[in-house]
């Protein structure tokens, strides 16, 4: 009966890593280039929870690139006035990344976390909205692009003021406390309970 301890370990590991325990992080990928009309208009909003990731994919080209030249950017986190004017100036403008290699695949990731051990990391507060803009480099054909990141959840009753698309598109599907846990979590709990009642574990 050496398989029973192994079965117990596998079940508990699956349970502890499941969304019911908050062990599942979501990733939202944004292709940061001027072919994205929502980034151009400034109405792109992403809702993420703590421990989720925002992945920014820089513009990249196969071959010579567009006739007007490749897009290259410096991406900043700014306050609301900087977002509205698309200006990365002042003490509340933080340079986050530089997309300067248009002929190679470059991707940056921002972990949405309350506390960070890194000196250059950023700490996010639930219920707050953060603003990202990109400023084209002088030789770039790019334009100002803007994105809002809303960090869930200050209060469970408050809803997002902006649509974020379908759950698969926005990267916000998954269990957030208060909603129904996933069927996998319920199945694992039921299996653990049955095995415990049968005194197998």
UniProtKB/Swiss-Prot annotation:
Function per UniProt: Cell surface GPI-bound ligand for Eph receptors, a family of receptor tyrosine kinases which are crucial for migration, repulsion and adhesion during neuronal, vascular and epithelial development. Binds promiscuously Eph receptors residing on adjacent cells, leading to contact-dependent bidirectional signaling into neighboring cells. May play a role in the interaction between activated B-lymphocytes and dendritic cells in tonsils.
Tissue: Expressed in the adult spleen, lymph node, prostate, ovary, small intestine, and colon, and in fetal heart, lung, liver and kidney. Also detected in hematopoietic cell lines.
CC per GO annotation: extracellular region; plasma membrane; side of membrane
The family this protein is said to belong to: Belongs to the ephrin family.
Protein name: Ephrin-A4
Residue span, Ephrin RBD domain: 26-155
Lineage: Eukaryota, Metazoa, Chordata, Craniata, Vertebrata
GO molecular-function terms, A-Z: ephrin receptor binding; transmembrane-ephrin receptor activity
Signal found in the keyword field: yes
């Amino acid at each position: 009966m050496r398989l029973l301890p192994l079965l117990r370990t596998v079940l508990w590991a699956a349970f502890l890593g499941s969304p019911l325990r908050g062990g599942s992080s979501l990733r939202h990928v944004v292709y940061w280039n001027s072919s994205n009309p929502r980034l151009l208009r400034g109405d792109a909003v992403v809702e993420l929870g703590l421990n989720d990731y925002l992945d920014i994919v820089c513009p990249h080209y196969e071959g010579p690139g567009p006739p007007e030249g490749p897009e290259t950017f410096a991406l900043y986190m700014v306050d609301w006035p900087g977002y509205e004017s698309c200006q990365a100036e002042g003490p509340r403008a933080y340079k986050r990344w530089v997309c300067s290699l248009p002929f190679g695949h470059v991707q940056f990731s921002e972990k949405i976390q309350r506390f960070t051990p890194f000196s250059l990391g950023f700490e996010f507060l639930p219920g707050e909205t953060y603003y990202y803009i990109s400023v084209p480099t002088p030789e770039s054909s790019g334009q100002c692009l803007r994105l809002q990141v809303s960090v869930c959840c200050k209060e469970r009753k408050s809803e997002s003021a902006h649509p974020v698309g379908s759950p698969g598109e926005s990267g916000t599907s998954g269990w957030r406390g208060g909603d129904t846990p996933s069927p996998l979590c319920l199945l694992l709990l039921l299996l653990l309970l049955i095995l415990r009642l049968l005194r197998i574990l």
